[in-house]
């Protein structure tokens, strides 16, 4: 594959990392999320009743559609360092890392390409996955990515055209000069192509347990 663009938006799930089979089994989730049980457990350790903690998490999640995990830390006063440690450990234990694409990202960055994360995860979710793939440091910085466009940054997921437009508007280049690297033929291929992206690289993956797939990706 030839990577001719100077700027690339790079997907995470299915491209750089994926969930191990069973990692996101329904019985392990809280309100449809695999990390919220960690938030709840920390709240219980702080003195919350379990049921009340789960309700408080749900209410906060519903109030702000495009939330990030740091908001739960701030709202409920759970210890920041321990929360980050457990969230990071979850990713270490439950993610598959696609080393072929990780090597590609490091190579492109070494060539001076300007790389940006384009993900359906909130900002901190992106960070933890990049850390698991050795693409971000413990202080949350990344020597490979200029910006991280999570769902709370762009106010939506990649299945929405306006979300792509908001990402394009934050890159100092015209849309035809921006490339995309991902695994989803629709979200990472057809949609950005319809908006004017020309340099698109879809990395095929064998069918494996993908954790929680949104309905849009199943069509």
Where are these regions (language model features)?
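Charged, low-complexity C-terminal accessory regions
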Residues: 61, 94-96, 126
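Asp-based, Mg2+/Mn2+-dependent phosphohydrolase catalytic module
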Residues: 1-10, 102-106, 113-219
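Active-site neighborhood of HAD-like aspartate-dependent phosphohydrolases
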Residues: 1-52
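Short histidine/acidic/glycine/proline-rich micro-motifs that form metal-
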Residues: 16, 23, 58-62, 91-92, ...
């Amino acid at each position: 594959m030839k990577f001719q663009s100077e700027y690339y938006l790079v997907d995470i799930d299915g491209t750089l990392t994926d969930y191990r089979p069973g990692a996101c089994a329904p019985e392990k989730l809280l309100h449809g999320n695999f990390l919220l049980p960690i938030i709840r457990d920390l709240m219980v350790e702080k003195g919350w009743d379990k049921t009340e903690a789960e309700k408080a998490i749900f209410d906060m999640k519903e109030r702000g559609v495009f939330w990030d995990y740091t908001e739960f830390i701030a709202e409920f006063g759970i210890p920041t360092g321990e929360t980050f440690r457990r969230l990071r450990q979850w990713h270490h234990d439950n993610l598959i890392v696609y080393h072929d694409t990780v090597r590609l990202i490091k190579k492109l960055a070494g060539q001076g390409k300007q790389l940006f994360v384009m993900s359906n995860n909130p900002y901190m979710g992106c960070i933890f996955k990049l850390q698991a793939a050795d693409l971000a440091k413990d202080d949350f910085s990344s020597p490979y990515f200029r910006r991280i466009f999570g769902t709370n940054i762009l106010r939506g997921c990649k299945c929405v055209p306006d979300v792509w437009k908001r990402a394009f508007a934050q890159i100092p280049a015209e849309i035809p000069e921006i490339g995309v690297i991902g695994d989803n033929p629709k979200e990472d291929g057809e949609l950005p192509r319809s908006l004017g992206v020309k340099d698109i690289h879809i990395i095929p993956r064998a069918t494996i347990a993908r954790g929680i797939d949104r309905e849009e990706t199943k069509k």
